[in-house]
Amino acid sequence: MTRLTAALAFVMLSAAAQGADAPPGAASCSGCHAANPRVETPVPPLGGRPAAEIASQMAAFKSGERKGTIMDRIAKGFSEEETRAIAAWYEQQK
């Protein structure tokens, strides 16, 4: 129960920490990926990564070129414009 509580608190705090300037959809990423590149998460943090890299990886998941546990399904839910906006926002999170 303690792990579950800690995990839920982390997700809620991560989403809240993104602030109002985050584009729609960015909060869904923070459940697994941290916006802060100095936070350790089981999957790579997105904060500070080049936008082109993030967008490219999302496109690879979306097309099926890159396999993932759930990223292929998540990527399909975003348009190219949404993906670019999310990627640009995460690049600025340093």
Model-derived regions, located:
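Sec-dependent signal peptide recognition
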Residues: M1-L8
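Electrostatic cytochrome c docking/interface patches
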Residues: F10-A26, V39-P44, A55, A60, ...
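Short, conserved glycine- and acidic-residue-centered signature motifs
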Residues: A22-G25, G47-P50, S79
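C-terminal capping alpha-helices of c-type cytochrome domains
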Residues: Q57, A75-K94
